[in-house]
From Swiss-Prot:
Family per record: Belongs to the universal ribosomal protein uL2 family.
Biological process per Gene Ontology, one example term: cytoplasmic translation
HAMAP family on file: Ribosomal_uL2_B
Role noted for this protein: One of the primary rRNA binding proteins. Required for association of the 30S and 50S subunits to form the 70S ribosome, for tRNA binding and peptide bond formation. It has been suggested to have peptidyltransferase activity; this is somewhat controversial. Makes several contacts with the 16S rRNA in the 70S ribosome.
GO CC terms: large ribosomal subunit
InterPro entries the UniProt entry points to: NA-bd_OB-fold, Rib_uL2_dom2, Ribosomal_uL2, Ribosomal_uL2_bac/org-type, Ribosomal_uL2_C, Ribosomal_uL2_CS, Ribosomal_uL2_dom3, Ribosomal_uL2_RNA-bd_dom
Family matches, as PROSITE patterns: RIBOSOMAL_L2
NCBIfam families given in the database record: rplB_bact (TIGR01171)
Segments for region (Disordered): 221-275
Molecular function GO labels: rRNA binding; structural constituent of ribosome; transferase activity
Pfam families documented for this protein: Ribosomal_L2, Ribosomal_L2_C
Name the record gives this protein: Large ribosomal subunit protein uL2
UniProt keyword list: Ribonucleoprotein, Ribosomal protein, RNA-binding, rRNA-binding
Length: 275
């Protein structure tokens, strides 16, 4: 993948950059049976109340059904296409299994059309193959990692992401996550070999506010620019500092204070993420 800069024919175009999409082999979804309608919520719940701010609008999309479980063991599959997915930063690969089934998976780096991938304990150590963490050698880069056996990959799924297998101890495997957190995961949980493709995704310059609106992202207003009724840091005469430590609209501190509440899984975190 490369990044293409555009000519500055207008102020809005001056800083825009785009992916060259050179790895994409299909200009539309190849398999109609693996796409579903996707209804927009605008960040609202069933009661119409905003539960996720800064969402709304954006281009209409179809959802691509991705196989995060990789539970079709010991059956080889051929990569038929590498496709664009508007719902995620990574590219997706269309697999044709030997028994006729078709599935989408996240496309790792260096996976090409015509390659063969497989999942299962006896799979080869190469990009795109999925297997239990217990079968993966130390130092290997992995992605799409399960946290619960059979639930499907939940972490390390965005473009360019990878975790590294650091150690194995009894029933657990120690992983270093992209955040630098060191975490123990059950050795029977599956992971996929390699790092997620589209590595240069973070280097693309959006260039203008309107392009974020195309992606369904609404403006993010600073708390100090609001009125006191809207935010704890709002109000004041002229330009103010907010008068307190940075926080959310509900008063939860947002810088330098630990706000993690899930004590149940603290036992699996060997070293917290570094900022």
């Amino acid at each position: 993948m490369g990044i293409r800069k555009v000519k500055p024919t207008s102020p809005g175009r001056r800083f825009q950059e785009y992916s060259t999409f050179e790895e994409i082999t299909a200009d539309r979804p190849s398999e109609k049976g693996l796409i579903e309608p996707l209804r927009k919520t605008g960040g609202r719940n069933v009661n119409g109340r905003i539960t996720c701010r800064h969402r709304g609008g954006g281009h209409k999309r179809h959802y691509r059904v991705i196989d995060f479980k990789r539970n079709k063991d010991d059956i080889p599959a051929k990569v038929a296409a590498i496709e664009y997915d508007p719902n995620r930063s990574a590219r997706i690969a269309l697999l044709f299994y030997a028994d006729g089934e078709k599935r989408y998976i996240l496309a790792p780096v260096n996976l090409k059309v015509g390659d063969t991938v497989m999942s299962g304990q006896a799979s080869e150590i190469k990009p795109g193959n999925a297997m239990p963490l217990a079968s993966i050698p130390l130092g290997t880069e992995v992605h799409n990692i399960e946290l619960r056996l059979g639930k499907g990959g939940q972490i390390v799924r965005s473009a360019g992401g990878y975790a590294k297998v650091m150690a194995k101890e009894a029933r657990y495997v120690l992983l270093r996550l992209p955040s630098s957190e060191m975490r123990k995961v059950l050795a029977t949980c599956k992971a996929t070999i390699g790092r997620v493709g589209n590595v240069e995704h973070d280097d693309v310059s959006i260039g203008k506010a309107g392009r974020n609106r195309w992606l369904g992202k609404r403006p993010r207003v600073r708390g100090v620019a609001m009125n006191p009724v809207d935010h704890p840091m709002g109000g004041g005469e002229g330009k103010s500092s907010g008068g307190r430590h940075p926080c959310s609209p509900w008063g939860q501190q947002s810088k330098g204070v630990r706000t993690r509440n899930n004590k149940r899984t603290d036992q699996f975190i060997v070293k917290r993420r570094s900022k």
